[in-house]
Structures are given as structure tokens and as C-alpha cells.
């Protein structure tokens, strides 16, 4: 009886292997809940490029393959194992065991060894991990195996199919993120992958990819409002957009159906401080050059003679203000979602940091400190630190942009009073960002 | 028994100092003789006993036949070099099956130091290339058996070198050496007339000319395995001679009934015939075959999709020695054919293994007929969806030792011990 049982299990393992090796476009695996089998029928199913295994045999198959691997694949160094599996049987067992239970790092490591010994093909490994992820989209071992494969693959090879490689990788991330909400592993894999590509593909392509990812994350974000992993990725995308070249920025602006400047001006116009007479109308602001706009908003002359890149600064503000309005809109639609409030914190933090940076200040232990100019490295040691900081700080706090932002936040917090996160947000701004006196 | 002269002096010196009785009572020649019966592991252990024993155990004469497969397979080249230096001319037989890190360098050393080797197994030594075979061809003229299974770098050059230098070759295995082609095989066939066994599974370039050469020049050829050589046609298979005992042409999809008829007339002593995936074969061919090849013991007819119950009728009548019959994926086979088979003379005594997986027309009735096959040990029924669990149980009642392979979940024995446990724990009982 035990012989027969073993034969059955081995036959099933062989069937699975046959499907795996014959069907190239296999994209999904799952265990089909069939508790009993009345008919003498194979529990291995292959329908429309999906692999299925009936649940009645899973326990036996797993037990057999797992013990076989542990006994014979030399995992215990203490026990000298006599029988050694040949590479094909080993692979067969590894495939089945990992499909059923992918959280076994030992087995993944064995696969890595096999890849290094050229017993396994990298592209087939990518396919296999994808199959595993189709069932367990949160399996970190599978993602890390994928990273390892891609890392060696991208470092060592001249890549011909880079484009398709990038596409499949992003698709895998999409699928896994879609299958399982708050899939941290998927998003961090995506982030790793984009970072990895930085050293490999040309800058132009990279910028195009940044734009694509920015747009993608916006769509995703508005559909998954409490997936902070996605928001984190969005923040990564925004930071990537900062670094776009002029040409890419143009294509970026064209690719969107919104005008950043208009959004920024709209935000400004709604929240202009009352006590000041503003000479500029909305149309004027829209038509201003970046330099003039920044002068108007920040009204600050740097003490040293360095040129500030007001174009990129202006772009960053535009980008962040758009993000802020987007976030406000989403918050109005979907109330009580903590992750969106956290994202808002990120946006405000970025804006405020950027202003500090522009004014040559930074926060150290909650106190503003003057720093040397990052371009010319001169420090005005003649004047007293405290005095400079006071004057610079005043300048900063009186600037139009700062006042507009503060006013906008105040309004928004009042507006969404019933949300307990709004109160927290206010506290965050007051205590963490140190705006207690200003709000 | 002789041992290397360079050690004689040392043996004399050490044996004088030894206190051990066995060394005093037995002459060195006898000790050496005793050691010669030991396997690799025991010899290595003996070599650690004393200096004398070390010399005796590692003497080349003990190492005429070495198989490292069960001992150690992650051997490096230096191990092989050591072995070849120690054994020298003594080495007759060496198996390095699965020693994947062995490369040409150490194999060259081996060829140089062990010219008398007769049987060399390099199965799965993936790094071995033509250089090894060239060295063997130059030095080892006594080589009779060589196994180069799964050495993908081996090409026609190897076969030429071997055929030039080793005229005594009888057994050659070059399976999965995909670059082997007609030229190499022809050279081998021409210069090694004693060839008895030639195995080239998965060598896609082996064609009709290659097999024709083997058939014409090697009249003693008994074993031919050309599994997966899908270029082969009836032309070459029809030329095979009367010495043929075991033939495997699985995967040669172009073969037709002509081959079977030719085999029937020319090779009446066939014992094993594997015809898997030869989908063009029909009942007519098997009728001719069954009439004359009465010694057939093993037949593999997997995926011969055209055959029907008629074939089984002919086999049942013509092949009284049939032991093992595989009919997987022969989708036209019905209970009637199985009934005929079970009534044949082979069924009662010889038939031990019967493969019926993926025969959708086979039902419970077939199993009832098979009850008369007393010797049946294994029956494969995977995916025969008309076969039920009850029928298998009945068959088991009649043939208690039979193994049935089917897709039914194994019956797990009821969990014992759950109800037998005392309701109170032991300490409560004591109190």
C-alpha cells in the first residue's frame, strides 16, 4: 500500500512537472478545493494556461516531496546523506513543494545554488516565481528570489529583451498588488526594480519610465485610498519627477491633462492673505515666468551671490501643490482614511523643507539653524547666528507661499472637523513641524 | 598476487615492527587477497589501520574495479589523478557516474596511466569533451565499454578517435550527446565490428545512414536504442540483423508497419521492443510481428494510437513469454482486448506488468478478466476514468500482492489511539 501511495504521489509530481515544462505561457497556479475523488482522474489540471491541483492530494504530495527533499538534498550538514538526488528529480520536487508552500527559504536557496551551477535557467526562474506569486502574492521569499535573479541577470548580461523584461516585472507587481491590498512586498519590489534600472538604462528612457510610473501611481492611489505601500511608492515617484530634465518635463506636462500652473495659481488665489494688497491677478500669475513667480511667492534675496535654480524650484512647488489639491479632493471623497492623511504630512513636510532649504535654513533639534550656502560654501560669520535666523525666519514666515499654505491647511482642517485625523494633522503641523505660533 | 615493487622494502620494514598477530600469521599476499574483496569504503577504512595496511589497501591490485557512485560524487579532478597513479595498469573498470566536476585534464592523466582499462562510465560527467576521448583512443586500446551518457560536449570527433584506437569496443552509449551525427556512428560501425550494444537516446542527428552502417558492419549488434531519433525511417530499421535482441525506437515517429514486418522476418529472436510514440503503426504490423517473434518479453506500445483489440489478440496468441506490456494512451483498447490477453498462455504465467493508463475505454470488466493473470504484480490505471474503486478492491482480493497505480486518494487508516486514552489523567487516577 505504501508503495502504491508513493507511486501515486510521484506520478502526480511528474504530471505537475510535465505541465510546467510543456506549457510555456503558464501564469497562474492554485489549489482547487476538491475534497474527494470518485473518478480515477488526474488531480493536475491545466486550463487556459492556469495550473490547478486538486486539494485531496495536496497533503500527501507535500509530505512526500518535503521529506524527500529534506532527507536527500543534503540540507543537514551534520548528517551525511548517502543518496543524492539528481538535478532533474531535485527540480521536480522543488517545484511542487514551493508551489504548495512558498515560504521555505532553504528551498529557494537550493534553487539559487542550482542557478549558479547553470542547472536552472534564469528566465524559467522568473516564470516560476511569477507562478508562485499568482497564488501567494505576499510571499517575500519569492520576491527576494526574483530580485536575486534579476540582479545577477541585469549585472552580467547584455540585455536584448530589456523592454519586455521591464514590462513583465511591472505587470507582476501590478498583479500582486492588485490581488492583495497593502502588499508591502510587491511595492517595495517595484521600488527596488526602478532603482535598479537607474544604472542600466539610458537617462531618457529612465525619465520616460518615471513619468509613466508617476501617472500609474496616481491612478492606483485614487483607487486604493488606504494602501499606504502605494502612497509610499507615490512619494518615491514624486521625488523621481524632481530630477526630470527640461525636455522630459515638457513631455511630462504634455502627458497630463491638467495644467500644474493653473492648479498652483488657483490654490494661491483662494488663500491669499487678506492683509496684503496683491498687485497680481490670476492671469498675471499664470503668465509669469518661473523666476518671477518664485520671487513673488518667496520674496527673498539670498545673502550670497549664487544663482538659485528657480525653474526647478517652481516645478517642485507646482508638483507638490498639485499633489496637495489631489489629496484634499480624495480626502473629501473618502473620509477617515489614515494613510491619506499621512501622505498629506509627507507633502507638507516636503513643501516646508524646500522653503527652509531655499532660505538657507534647516531644522536641528526643533530649532532653526542657518547653514552655509550649498553652492558657494560661504558662511557669514560676522553677523550673529541668532540675528540672521530671526531675520531669515521672519522672511520665510512672511512669504506669500508660506502664508498661503498655512491658510489652506487651517481651512482644510476646519472643513473636515468630524474626522479625528484632522485634529491629529493639526497637532502634527503645530508640534512636529514647529508651526505652533503661526497657526 | 603482486604489488608494486617500490613498496616492497617498506612492507618488509613495517611488518618486522608490527605486534599484530594477523600481520605475523598471514603472508602479505594473502592479506592483499583478502583486501581485494572489499569495497571502496572498507578499503579506505583499512588504509587507516596501520602503515602496512595503508600500503596494502592502497595497492593498485585492489582497485581494479571502482564505482564511486554510491561513495562520493562531488569528487574533484585530483581524486581521479590519484586513483590513476595508484592503480596504473591494474585498473579495468571505472565508473564516474554523476561526478559532474570531472574535466578533461584529469581524464587525460587517467588515460595515460591506466592503459588497460576496459570499462569506463562517464555518465553525466558534463565537463568531459572530445579531448578525453582522443586521449582514450590514443592510449587505451583495450577499451570495451564506454558510457558517455549526457556529456553534451562530446561530438563525432570522439567517436572517430575511439573507433581508431579501440577496436575491441562492444558497448557504446552516447545518449543525449546531441552533436553526434551519422559520420561518427559510421566511423564507429566500420572499425568496431564486435559492437554489441549501441545506445544513442535523444541524438537527433542520427539518421538512416548511421543505423544502416551499424546494421551492415556490426553483425553482432544485439542492443540498439535510438529513442527520439525522429529522422529514422523504415529504410534503416528494415536492415537490422538477426542478432538483435533489444530494440528501442520510441519516438521515431516516421516508422510504419513496413518496419514491423521487416523486424518480423529478420529479427525473430527479439526480446524487448519499445515502440512508444510510433503513432503510424497499425494492427497489420503487429500481426506480422506476433507471428514470428515468439520470444518477445517486453513491449512498450505507449501512444501507438491506431492499434485496437486486434493487436492484443495477435500478441496474446503469438507471444507466450510476454512479461511486460505497456499500452498507455492506446485509446482504442477495450475490455475485449484485455479479455483476450488474459486468456492467452502468457497471461497465466509470465505477465507481470501491464500499463493501461489513459485508456479511456477500459472499464471494471477488464479488471475482472485480469483476475486470471496470477503473476500480475503491477497494473497502471491512471486516468482510466471508467474504472472504479470497487473493481480495484475486487482485483486485490484475488491477487493480494498486486500493486495498482491509479489516481484514487490512498485510504488513510483511521486515527488510532484517540478513543483508547483514559478519560482522566494519570495523576487523578492515583489520587
Predicted regions and their residues:
Chain B
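Short, solvent-exposed loop/turn at the beta-strand->alpha-helix junction
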Residues: 72-78, 100-105, 126-131, 152-157, ...
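N-terminal adaptor-interaction module of cullin-RING ubiquitin ligase components
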Residues: 1-111, 115-116, 124, 129, ...
Amino acid at each position: 500500500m505504501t508503495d502504491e501511495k508513493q507511486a501515486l504521489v510521484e506520478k502526480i509530481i511528474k504530471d505537475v512537472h510535465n505541465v510546467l515544462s510543456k506549457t510555456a505561457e503558464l501564469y497562474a497556479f492554485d489549489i482547487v478545493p476538491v475534497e474527494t475523488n470518485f473518478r480515477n482522474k488526474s488531480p493536475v489540471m491545466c486550463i487556459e494556461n492556469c495550473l490547478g491541483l486538486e486539494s485531496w492530494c495536496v497533503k500527501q504530495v507535500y509530505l512526500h516531496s518535503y521529506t524527500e527533499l529534506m532527507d536527500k538534498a543534503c540540507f543537514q550538514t551534520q548528517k551525511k546523506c548517502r543518496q543524492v538526488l539528481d538535478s532533474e528529480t531535485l527540480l521536480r520536487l522543488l517545484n511542487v513543494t514551493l508551489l504548495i508552500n512558498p515560504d521555505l527559504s532553504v528551498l529557494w536557496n537550493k534553487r539559487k545554488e542550482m542557478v549558479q551551477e547553470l542547472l536552472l535557467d534564469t528566465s524559467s526562474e522568473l516564470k516560476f516565481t511569477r507562478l508562485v506569486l499568482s497564488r501567494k502574492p505576499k510571499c517575500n521569499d519569492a520576491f527576494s528570489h526574483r530580485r536575486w535573479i534579476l540582479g545577477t541577470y541585469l549585472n552580467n548580461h547584455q540585455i536584448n529583451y530589456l523592454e519586455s523584461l521591464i514590462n513583465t516585472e511591472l505587470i507582476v507587481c501590478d498583479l500582486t498588488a492588485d490581488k492583495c491590498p497593502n502588499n508591502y512586498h510587491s511595492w517595495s519590489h517595484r521600488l527596488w526594480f526602478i532603482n535598479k534600472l537607474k544604472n542600466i538604462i539610458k537617462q531618457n528612457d529612465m525619465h520616460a519610465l518615471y513619468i509613466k510610473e508617476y501617472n500609474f501611481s496616481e491612478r492606483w492611489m485614487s483607487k486604493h485610498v488606504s494602501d499606504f505601500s502605494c502612497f509610499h511608492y507615490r512619494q518615491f515617484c514624486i521625488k523621481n519627477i524632481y530630477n526630470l530634465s527640461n525636455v522630459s518635463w515638457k513631455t511630462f506636462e504634455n502627458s497630463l491633462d491638467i495644467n500644474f500652473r493653473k492648479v498652483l495659481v488657483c490654490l494661491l488665489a483662494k488663500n491669499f492673505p487678506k492683509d496684503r494688497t496683491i498687485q497680481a491677478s490670476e492671469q498675471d500669475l499664470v503668465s509669469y515666468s518661473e523666476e518671477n513667480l518664485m520671487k513673488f511667492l518667496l520674496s527673498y534675496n539670498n545673502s550670497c551671490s549664487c544663482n538659485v535654480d528657480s525653474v526647478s524650484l517652481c516645478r517642485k512647488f507646482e508638483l507638490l501643490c498639485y499633489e496637495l489639491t489631489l489629496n484634499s479632493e480624495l480626502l473629501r471623497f473618502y473620509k477617515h482614511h489614515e494613510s491619506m492623511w499621512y501622505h498629506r504630512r509627507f507633502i507638507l513636510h516636503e513643501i516646508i523643507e524646500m522653503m527652509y532649504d531655499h532660505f538657507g535654513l534647516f531644522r536641528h533639534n526643533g530649532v532653526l539653524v542657518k547653514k552655509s550656502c550649498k553652492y558657494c560654501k560661504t558662511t557669514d560669520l560676522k553677523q550673529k547666528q541668532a540675528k540672521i535666523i530671526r531675520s531669515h525666519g521672519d522672511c520665510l514666515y512672511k512669504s506669500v507661499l508660506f502664508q498661503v499654505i498655512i491658510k489652506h491647511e487651517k481651512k482644510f482642517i476646519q472643513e473636515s472637523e468630524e474626522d479625528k485625523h484632522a485634529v491629529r494633522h493639526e497637532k502634527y503641523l503645530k508640534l512636529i513641524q514647529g508651526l505652533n505660533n503661526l497657526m | 598476487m603482486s604489488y608494486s615493487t617500490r613498496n616492497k622494502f617498506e612492507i618488509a620494514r613495517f611488518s618486522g615492527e608490527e605486534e599484530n598477530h594477523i600481520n605475523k600469521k598471514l603472508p602479505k599476499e594473502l592479506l592483499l587477497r583478502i583486501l581485494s574483496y572489499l569495497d571502496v569504503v572498507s578499503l579506505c577504512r583499512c588504509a587507516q589501520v596501520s602503515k602496512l595496511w595503508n600500503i596494502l589497501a592502497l595497492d593498485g591490485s585492489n582497485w581494479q574495479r571502482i564505482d564511486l557512485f554510491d561513495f562520493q560524487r562531488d569528487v574533484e579532478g585530483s581524486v581521479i589523478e590519484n586513483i590513476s597513479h595508484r592503480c596504473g595498469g591494474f585498473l579495468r573498470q571505472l565508473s564516474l557516474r554523476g561526478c559532474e566536476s570531472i574535466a578533461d585534464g584529469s581524464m587525460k592523466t587517467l588515460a595515460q596511466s591506466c592503459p588497460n582499462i576496459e570499462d569506463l562510465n562517464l555518465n553525466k560527467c558534463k565537463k568531459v569533451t572530445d579531448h578525453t576521448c582522443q586521449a582514450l583512443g590514443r592510449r587505451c586500446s583495450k577499451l570495451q565499454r564506454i558510457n558517455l551518457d549526457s556529456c553534451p560536449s562530446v561530438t563525432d570527433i570522439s567517436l572517430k578517435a575511439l573507433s581508431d584506437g579501440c577496436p575491441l569496443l562492444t558497448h557504446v552509449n552516447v545518449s543525449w550527446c546531441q552533436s553526434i551525427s551519422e559520420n561518427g556512428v559510421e566511423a564507429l560501425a566500420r572499425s568496431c565490428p564486435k559492437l554489441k550494444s549501441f545506445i544513442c537516446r535523444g541524438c537527433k542527428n542520427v539518421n538512416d545512414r548511421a543505423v544502416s552502417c551499424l546494421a551492415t558492419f556490426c553483425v553482432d549488434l544485439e542492443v540498439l536504442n535510438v529513442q527520439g531519433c525522429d529522422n529514422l525511417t523504415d529504410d534503416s530499421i528494415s536492415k537490422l540483423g538477426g542478432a538483435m535482441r533489444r530494440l528501442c525506437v520510441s519516438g521515431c515517429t516516421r516508422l510504419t508497419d513496413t518496419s514491423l514486418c521487416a523486424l518480423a522476418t529478420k529479427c525473430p529472436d527479439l526480446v524487448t521492443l519499445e515502440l512508444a510514440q510510433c503513432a503510424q503503426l497499425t494492427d497489420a504490423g503487429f500481426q506480422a510481428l506476433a507471428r514470428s517473434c515468439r520470444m518477445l518479453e517486453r513491449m512498450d506500445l505507449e501512444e501507438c494510437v491506431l492499434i485496437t483489440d486486434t493487436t492484443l489478440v495477435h500478441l496474446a496468441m503469438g507471444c507466450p513469454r510476454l512479461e511486460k506490456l505497456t499500452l498507455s494512451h492506446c485509446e482504442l483498447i477495450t475490455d475485449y482486448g484485455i479479455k483476450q490477453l488474459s486468456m492467452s498462455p502468457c497471461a497465466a504465467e509470465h505477465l507481470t506488468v501491464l500499463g493501461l493508463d489513459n485508456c479511456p475505454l477500459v472499464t471494471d470488466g477488464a479488471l475482472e478478466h485480469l483476475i486470471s493473470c496470477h503473476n500480475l504484480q503491477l497494473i497502471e490505471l491512471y486516468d482510466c476514468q471508467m474504472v472504479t474503486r470497487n473493481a480495484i478492491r475486487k482485483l486485490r482480493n484475488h491477487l493480494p500482492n498486486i500493486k495498482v497505480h491509479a489516481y484514487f486518494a490512498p485510504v488513510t487508516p483511521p486515527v488510532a489511539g484517540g478513543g483508547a486514552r483514559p478519560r482522566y489523567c494519570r495523576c487523578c487516577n492515583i489520587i
